[in-house]
Amino acid sequence: MEICWGPYSHLISLLLILLFHSEAACRPSGKRPCKMQAFRIWDTNQKTFYLRNNQLIAGYLQGPNIKLEEKIDMVPIDLHSVFLGIHGGKLCLSCAKSGDDIKLQLEEVNITDLSKNKEEDKRFTFIRSEKGPTTSFESAACPGWFLCTTLEADRPVSLTNTPEEPLIVTKFYFQEDQ
């Protein structure tokens, strides 16, 4: 499958496959089709995500509770932008604005129906930034707001505009689910 078009397409394709193997199925131009992939995700304090009362929670799951772990479904839009969801892409993470209040929501939307080119879908778009082995996710609709957890376990996954605050975790590990 050719990833890019143009005189340097083979070099760019090779670099993308080597550097971004999980996103190699998507053309960098943002044109579809991009395949959805499921990932295990955990914060730098080893908290995983699970669903409680229709809210995404970060906590330490052990024993029989391990089966509650939510996998994050990701659809690459372009080299750094992604849509994120859970439950097979049927519940999508979005950035909701209400006055000065900005919060993370789960919306019943099929992740594969979203489009980078639709303004109304911008709230579902997250900019993925890698720094070493960790990744952060910034809302495209609310620049400066990052997906986060708190140091305390069993608290909601949310958004913050103070990513350097000591009680907030904005860096995540993730690996493709087998």
UniProtKB/Swiss-Prot annotation:
PROSITE patterns: INTERLEUKIN_1 (PS00253). It comes from the Eukaryota. Disulfide bonds join C92-C142. Disruption phenotype: Deficient mice still possess other negative regulators of IL1 activity and adapt to excessive IL1 via shedding of IL1R1. One of its GO terms (molecular function) is cytokine activity. InterPro entries: IL-1_CS (IPR020877), IL-1_fam (IPR000975), IL-1RA/IL-36 (IPR003297), IL1/FGF (IPR008996). Keywords: Cytoplasm, Disulfide bond, Glycoprotein, Secreted, Signal. GO terms for biological process: immune response; inflammatory response; insulin secretion; lipid metabolic process; negative regulation of heterotypic cell-cell adhesion; negative regulation of interleukin-1-mediated signaling pathway; response to glucocorticoid. Belongs to the IL-1 family. Anti-inflammatory antagonist of interleukin-1 family of proinflammatory cytokines such as interleukin-1beta/IL1B and interleukin-1alpha/IL1A. Protects from immune dysregulation and uncontrolled systemic inflammation triggered by IL1 for a range of innate stimulatory agents such as pathogens. This is Interleukin-1 receptor antagonist protein. It comes from Mus musculus (Mouse). The gene is Il1rn.
